[in-house]
Amino acid sequence: MPPSAASEGGVAELRAAEVASYTRKAVDERPDLTIVGDAVYDAKAFRDEHPGGAHFVSLFGGRDATEAFMEYHRRAWPKARMSKFFVGSLDASEKPTQADSAYLRLCAEVNALLPKGSGGFAPPSYWLKAAALVVAAVSIEGYMLLRGKTLLLSVFLGLVFAWIGLNIQHDANHGALSRHSVINYCLGYAQDWIGGNMVLWLQEHVVMHHLHTNDVDADPDQKAHGVLRLKPTDGWMPWHALQQLYILPGEAMYAFKLLFLDALELLAWRWEGEKISPLARALFAPAVACKLGFWARFVALPLWLQPTVHTALCICATVCTGSFYLAFFFFISHNFDGVGSVGPKGSLPRSATFVQRQVETSSNVGGYWLGVLNGGLNFQIEHHLFPRLHHSYYAQIAPVVRTHIEKLGFKYRHFPTVGSNLSSMLQHMGKMGTRPGAEKGGKAE
């Protein structure tokens, strides 16, 4: 981005730049501001005019939104249009985040493939799938409340919850379902219906994971708190030698963190040590209400109606099945043999382009029909490049994306089957679980 964000914004913007200069630390302490390129903008004033919803802008209060805007809008920052929200420049001592020109060229190719006038949002046929999932979830849960829980139906309900997570809340919370932000916002609460939390999900995925994929410090999904060794900067523990054996049952047990421990993160208004922007505080009360509502609806009410061990086991079966399905497909997408990691001791520097950081830390698996079942998230590369593009288009654009990526000289990994992806993940976990230096006969780090 040019040194002055005022070049297209007029004299008033230039004068503002002369009197206002912000370091990243200063912006971090001002949740009403956000950084794009080398300029600082009034996020609080802009959020209510944001077509995609005020909550997206609010979550980036006090943060750098350069790459977030780029990947969610698939175009360059409209400096002239945004000049009325300009409040100053990024301090000369700071290095601005640059837009990725190769990525913007890829966006132009992909946009040309989309149905005219669609904007990349959900096609009409998608809503039949969404309706079927909602009807299935409500019917099964209602039936078991009235007639009693069964283990088989509880497991199937867990799968339906997972499919709702993959096919409804995921696109909604990326703003990819509809051009009407209120629809995305409301359906985003499907995450709360299945036991998660929309605000924490947005912080984890939109604010952190998507911008810092497999970063050894900044990606929350690379933090296993000693349970697993996922990245080269993690310390080694003896049990890591067995992590390829316990990773799969551990994915089912993740349900209990999601169900209970995440509430502590919500109350602290943070995720993995990263504060949620105070500008998004209006989301707090609905988030707490939804968490309490889920506990009442899915845990307390069934146990009140049928206070038995069987009921408790069926509740666990649902949440563990859903947790396993979601965690399994997510984990194999970002943890496989040869996967990139970003930052110190990683295979990629943080100065690598946006495209390279997204592509070489992700992988695809399977094809069109797995995409129908899993909300397109088996096309994880395409999803990470275009998170606000509805999943129904991923299989269509994948060949063009792959050609473009390989021309750039970057690694594009697509596993033909889930089994081959799983095997690669287990191989990677085995390598990461080996005591550093042991494979060479050396001492542990």
Swiss-Prot record:
InterPro entries: Cyt_B5-like_heme/steroid-bd, Cyt_B5-like_heme/steroid_sf, FA_desaturase_dom, Fatty_acid_desaturase. A motif (Histidine box-2) lies at residues 205-210. Residues 11-91 form the Cytochrome b5 heme-binding domain. The keyword Lipid biosynthesis applies. The keyword Lyase does not apply. It is found in: Membrane. GO terms for cellular component: membrane. Pfam families: Cyt-b5, FA_desaturase. A motif (Histidine box-1) lies at residues 170-174. PROSITE patterns: CYTOCHROME_B5_2. The chain crosses the membrane at residues 126-146, 148-168, 247-267, 283-303, 312-332. A motif (Histidine box-3) lies at residues 380-384. Belongs to the fatty acid desaturase type 1 family. This is Acyl-lipid (7-3)-desaturase.
